From Swiss-Prot:
Residues 1546-1559 have a biased composition (Low complexity). PANTHER family: SORTILIN RELATED (PTHR12106), SORTILIN-RELATED RECEPTOR (PTHR12106:SF27). Functions as a sorting receptor in the Golgi compartment required for the intracellular sorting and delivery of soluble vacuolar proteins, like carboxypeptidase Y (CPY) and proteinase A. May execute multiple rounds of sorting by cycling between the late Golgi and a prevacuolar endosome-like compartment. Binds the Golgi-modified P2 form of CPY, and this interaction is dependent on the presence of an intact CPY vacuolar protein sorting signal. Residues 1415-1579 are cytoplasmic. It is a single-pass type I membrane protein. SUPFAM superfamilies: Oligoxyloglucan reducing end-specific cellobiohydrolase (SSF110296), Sialidases (SSF50939). It comes from Saccharomyces cerevisiae (strain ATCC 204508 / S288c) (Baker's yeast). Its main location: Golgi. BNR repeats lie at residues 57-68, 101-112, 179-190, 415-426, 487-498, 533-544, 764-775, 861-872, 1143-1154, 1184-1195. This is Vacuolar protein sorting/targeting protein VPS10. Keywords: Glycoprotein, Golgi apparatus, Membrane, Nucleotide-binding, Protein transport, Receptor, Repeat, Signal, Transmembrane, Transmembrane helix, Transport. The chain crosses the membrane at residues 1398-1414.
Amino acid sequence: MILLHFVYSLWALLLIPLTNAEEFTPKVTKTIAQDSFDILSFDDSNTLIRKQDTSVTISFDDGETWEKVEGIEGEITWIYIDPFNRHDRAVATAMNGSYLYITNDQGKSWERITLPDSGESISPRECYIETHPLNKNYFLAKCNYCEKTEVNNDNEENSGDEEGQFEIFNITRCTDKVFASNDGGKSFSEIKSSLERNENSPISISDCGFAKTSKDSDLESSDTSIICLFQNMQLIMDEFSSPYTESKLVLTTDWGKSLKEFDQFKDKVVNGYRILKSHMVVLTQGDRYNDMSSMDVWVSNDLSNFKMAYMPTQLRHSMQGEIYEDAMGRIILPMSRERSDQEEDKGIVSEILISDSQGLKFSPIPWTANEVFGYINFYQPTYLKGTMIASLYPLSRRRNRKGKAKGVKSKGVTKISVDNGLTWTMLKVVDPDNADSFDCDITDFENCSLQNMFYTREGSTPTAGILMTTGIVGDGSVFDWGDQRTFISRDGGLTWKLAFDFPCLYAVGDYGNVIVAIPYNADEDDDPQSEFYYSLDQGKTWTEYQLETTIYPNEVMNTTPDGSGAKFILNGFTLAHMDGTTNFIYAIDFSTAFNDKTCEENDFEDWNLAEGKCVNGVKYKIRRRKQDAQCLVKKVFEDLQLFETACDKCTEADYECAFEFVRDATGKCVPDYNLIVLSDVCDKTKKKTVPVKPLQLVKGDKCKKPMTVKSVDISCEGVPKKGTNDKEIVVTENKFDFKIQFYQYFDTVTDESLLMINSRGEAYISHDGGQTIKRFDSNGETIIEVVFNPYYNSSAYLFGSKGSIFSTHDRGYSFMTAKLPEARQLGMPLDFNAKAQDTFIYYGGKNCESILSPECHAVAYLTNDGGETFTEMLDNAIHCEFAGSLFKYPSNEDMVMCQVKEKSSQTRSLVSSTDFFQDDKNTVFENIIGYLSTGGYIIVAVPHENNELRAYVTIDGTEFAEAKFPYDEDVGKQEAFTILESEKGSIFLHLATNLVPGRDFGNLLKSNSNGTSFVTLEHAVNRNTFGYVDFEKIQGLEGIILTNIVSNSDKVAENKEDKQLKTKITFNEGSDWNFLKPPKRDSEGKKFSCSSKSLDECSLHLHGYTERKDIRDTYSSGSALGMMFGVGNVGPNLLPYKECSTFFTTDGGETWAEVKKTPHQWEYGDHGGILVLVPENSETDSISYSTDFGKTWKDYKFCADKVLVKDITTVPRDSALRFLLFGEAADIGGSSFRTYTIDFRNIFERQCDFDITGKESADYKYSPLGSKSNCLFGHQTEFLRKTDENCFIGNIPLSEFSRNIKNCSCTRQDFECDYNFYKANDGTCKLVKGLSPANAADVCKKEPDLIEYFESSGYRKIPLSTCEGGLKLDAPSSPHACPGKEKEFKEKYSVSAGPFAFIFISILLIIFFAAWFVYDRGIRRNGGFARFGEIRLGDDGLIENNNTDRVVNNIVKSGFYVFSNIGSLLQHTKTNIAHAISKIRGRFGNRTGPSYSSLIHDQFLDEADDLLAGHDEDANDLSSFMDQGSNFEIEEDDVPTLEEEHTSYTDQPTTTDVPDTLPEGNEENIDRPDSTAPSNENQ
């Protein structure tokens, strides 16, 4: 019994601590305050401070009691603890910013620091202090001043003359000022910006910082070294709305008295910098005129020498403030995603790049590199060496809308690494007690693990491996806020257990032995009051503490930042009143837990980081309290101690790949050709190979015995040497086991995003021009179609094989997934509203068990919310257009037009509606072949009798007019026509005249401004069976068109010969045509074999549109003005493609040069500043490039093995310096598809200096396009062009900058023939035989406000021409009154009789008085008229009494001589004519009638009257077209010579460009009903 009693007593004694623990209740003290947030702790103290409304309050007892700080005046906007003096210093900033308060004794006393007068007219908006890690007296005060101002946009010098000028924003004017102090704020001196600021720079930034940012800084710098970045920004308004930036990065060591600029960045735009422990990182903007351009990263460890780091992708939106350095000296570089229009997506981290230990080679987290694009959470606790936790979530999942996400399985994933990222594992849930509460098998770690979502630094308080987080257990496919729970880990994050079924805020104390958690939602426990939970056994058990109020928790924190204390602050708020919040601040004290017991030695255990493995050459361990120990550590204000033991042997984990090597799929370091090019290993040898060690010891690794690393021989063949431009070219290669079937760029300047589809129907996205390519997760659906929105450049739609539609409005960064209507996909393209991004029409098949089912028919479905919901709009519709959004002046903005084909009918009708066919439905045409829209017109093809077509045109959707084609002798039935382009108020159309397959050709036509009246520009223009035409309008230049004609069209039509093609060019939009002038010598300096001076026999011919593999590969580029490439030959006709060479022009086609002997593919970059050629249809390992506009060419080897390049491409604007090659190479076991991204950014020394007002500068000059200053469209134009080949242009719309030197006199080239007139071989416009001019009075019907009209002269002025004076070939006839407007017409031209009669009578009276005076004084008193015959010169018989008499007599004598000479001349002429007639009759006998010689241009004006006599109806009376007061002489430059130009005056017409609205081609074809042409023609 005694023994039993003893055991019972002992058990009772052991139970006492546990009972005390269970019964323990923390001390909770409540404080109520108004608008109080951000409670701050002084390190190693019991003092807290917080801002309450606009004042500062302080607590000296861990938050139990608070008092207002006395001595602080004014309104306080911000308080913060000095990061380098956390124990005792804090700063409070005032609202007006001209002063602040500082404490150096934990808030007991505050000193007011007054900042110096900045010289600005206003007080600073805000100021804050930056301190020094080593010297408490060193301050940098940074202040921001803003005031609203109006920026003057006017530029009198340039106004009206130069086009494309930028407009400066009116914006708030802001300036940064930096003041430095070395005496604790007693005095300051300003560090003034070294940039001059002008009135157009509304933003001036000064960002300065001490070069030492930590007490253990490794940077080689003095304590007084200060780095400053000065920037001036000018916001420019163009279509990109992008700021222009100039910058200077400087160093000062004397507090701003002298500034030393970093030479390496003098010609660069520094976007930002970051000073780390052992590195300084500088980010430079690739393009100063595009703040969204890619950036380069420069790294230095001595503030003197900077090296450019290698980036695996484009860095565009770095989060500079988040760049930091880990314990191994590696730079962690977060990249934010593009600036989305979606507010919730802004500022989200999208990718984490980690450098090697040298800071020079960056790479992404390995398991995220090839996954779908998403956003990343990244956390690296400094007290857990080598530990990283990262979460990746695809943005496609984030953008799913409610009710539409059921079928979406886009998976996110969270992983952890405990060895510095060498290996990664899932966050394992090891919790058998709660296994049944999860929806998946937690023992299957790969498919059931903890997924973390939020970008927060969980567990930032140091603990011995005890972490908490919120998340969801699953495979990552479902993640919703309501599903989150709270989890805890005791092994540094490797395994986790469930803590709560709801998400919580949490904090830890006593090194993790005390944990406090509070639910975000007070209703989690089914009562309205809030509560918090606490654990005293490292999360094993939890106790609830009930609060009496419902609060929204804002923060919970340990009062000791090092996590050593056991006191906490909980700050929550309620929305008690409209003006602000009521805060409830709870001080929670656990210091007396376990009866105030302090842990002893046997209460502790060792916990090993990374499961005891070596990390950084060291094994780490922490002494921590055992989980069930009934005590607290109570080492308040002592930092958590980490014990380390160096590892004896180094392993591969202690090494990283050398710069020239990358890890392959197996983790082995293998040579990378592109990195070898960037390094200098081959610069030091002349041998073909060089030995290099593939591994290097990680900087800072502490393992004792290094490994033996064997060198690998690297090939140096083809590697450029240092000092050459080729050394700076960066190539990135990607290999695939599939072929890319489709690709297309998004046409924006934000980045170089493109979408690709492979042969398996998988979609891939790249945002850096193909450098990195990531697969799009389509949830297992094959992508069967891709549609880009032609009106919104960031939008595209992907169709899945299972009925899903994936839409993106941010160039593929995020996708919204929706289900298409329950209808069969017919493969018809979407039709978009030009003015509403989310509105489009989808076509699906209804009742289509089979596509051949009798009841299967098409239905047009309408969506107004981007595909979230669809409604049936119209049955049997196969093509609709939002007509109201297309017209400039629509009759109704909501009008929709649809082509309808009833199942029971073989015809198609055109219907319209203004309410999406709910109640309004109007039949426009009952029977059509098809219709299309282009350039503000809608053109409808209507069948006519005898299998002909007729075209009708509308410009408002209501009024349709028949398109009148010219009557011509060689035009038969109108069986097929192709709409080529509509621009500048005219439609270009190809009317087929021969439709025999393989022998197709036709006439090129051009319309008037409303598209209803066409004239022939050129005959026998080549087309193919698909309706495509050899026609291309040169981009960026007015009126230049290239076309191929069938020179032997008559014999081709008779089936006697195959086509023989010739290339023609026009410089005035088809009015006149010439053959291309051939170069005199080829690319080898040899003369061409054909040497005829006649261009008809020897000219340059180019392969055209009908032969292209990719119709996007045009001759020209809209940004490279005047430049064109083409594959062709010099000779009488065009030769087969393989026999041709590559030619180039820089003056819009006036002169050409051969650049390559074989066919090459080409691409333009940097607005023509970089040109690239690659062989076509032959394997190669090199490209040719030019940086001097094609004058010289260099070859560059871009890969080690030869590949067959399928295509070369770049961004649609041709403004980038990066090109993408698609190639195919033979590999063992088959072929592999490859892409090569070739980056030329670094070959240029600098960016060209551009004046945003368009003025000339050292790098840009205005010059004419060609070799002569010819007039084109009635004016002489000069274009702004780069003059220095060593600089690059960048994001400047250079093609928009031009200026008109003068308007020229009108010449024949400024006119074209009017309707029913044709251009004869002599260049004149003649009326078609048997026809009359068009009824000129029709214009009155179209324009009811007109009161008069004019008859046609046969000519009309080309719409683009601005000529003045000169020829008036389109001079109107006398005006005629419009029908019904006779009264107004008379009022306009009638003249009042009163004033006219007065003037007339006055003139008559003056004449009569003068005549009577002369007669009376000079004739009558001198003898009258009888004496006329007696007057002789010098006769002194006349009466002359005064000067008046002498003047009158002289007048009389002069009159006498004039009249007598006229009489004599008439008599003499009569006699000579009689003699001449007699001689002619005798010599020529019976020959009668005039004889005319052939007219050439030099004779045009001189012989016009003779030539055109008797042909007034042909509009050839030039005398009425000339300005009576003008000089009619035509200069030599204005009139071509017969030898050069006469061949252009044929009876053949011209061709036109491809409409921009078509996704694949720029041509639309409308054919006859019985045509055999393929389906891309409207039949």
